[in-house]
Amino acid sequence: MSLGSGFRENISHQDLVSNRRNVYNVIYETNYRTWRKSYMDLTKLSAYEIIEHRDLPDLKSEGALLKHKKSGARVLLISNDDENKVFNIGFRTPTTNSTGVPHIMEHTVLCGSEKFPTKDPFVELVKGSLNTFLNAMTYPDKTVYPVASCNEKDFQNLMDVYMDAVLHPNIYKHEEIFRQEGWNYHLEEADGELSYNGVVYNEMKGAFSSPDGVLDRMILNSLFPDTTYANESGGDPDVIPELTYEEYLNFHRTYYHPSNSYIYLYGNMDMEEKLNWLDQEYLSAYDKKEVDSEIHLQKPFEKMHDITKPYSIASNESTEDNTYLSYNKVIGTSLDEKLYLAFQILDYALLSAPGAPITKALLEAGIGKDISGSYDSSTYQPIFSIVAKNANEEQKAEFVKVIEDTLKGIVENGMDKKALEAGINYHEFRYREA
């Protein structure tokens, strides 16, 4: 076939460039698929059900979603030529109180396991592993354990340590792990005052003393009073000591099961080998079970709520120009991809771009000295927030009016096209670099 045979003199230069780009894309995709098909053949994996399997051309990757037949574990694969291999296992961990049990669990499962009984394998990995990333994080509704490494042997060891940690931790054998990481009674001297201590307890005391941290928690808790988000998954220092050892163990028994897990593998690796290893070493030992970890939706409020919460300042600080004002809205659900992308762009265009209309309007009105916005999609129902720092409490009504008047004006007159294009370009670059 001649590439030039279909062109005529009335085709524009732009059309020509577009067609040339399409030809290049076909050549690239053909080569890519040849490599992919010879690299990730999932048809021989009898232990797994293939739910979806497709190309991800924007990521130059191949993706697959599987379910382990016996245990019910879900597995997401992203196969490509990136040598920085990534593994993550996560569990949905809703909580009904603010004792911080998800956070304490995250700390304690990494304090020794059946295969790796050392007191603190996490510290040993930090010192001796070739990892490019090593962590564990507690969110308001989930707990995740991600690792990454460019070295195959090191990566395999990291997977083994983390899988054994979350499924076979030493917490059932040694109550002192819970006491050390969660909370315990502390007595400095025989005649001294009894106090609370513990790694998570002390960590959250620090977190609760931060004005920004107080505001973030207040936004989340107040917008979702009837859901798990009304509770502090990290733990409220005043409530943490209410957690008992047996309640803590029951939390692990309930939620740290493969049926409630999501496993993620990314990068250039033998995916079939990794999946077989997961099946034989861990998942095949578990039978599927029902785990009630559903994250419920918050019903809409009938009217806007107005909440005030004090925070501590230094004795030599003035209360003038020291108030945070925050305007917050719940926006759909995190499963709506188009809405998610739209608000990422709007957040930039409305509040971060040069001459951003809401930021400009608030500063011109003298409300706050630092205006910021955020679109937090880490929860089931994302939150769009506008925050004015270094403001005053008596400016609250004007703060709301300026924001809503500005938004009404944008609805009536439209947005600056260049600001929207800048937002699109900014996020497109971020996604391609990620």
What are these regions (language model features)?
Residues 40-82:
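N- or domain-start disorder-to-order transition segments that initiate the globular core
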Residues 62-69, 305-317:
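Short acidic-hydrophobic surface loop/beta-edge motif
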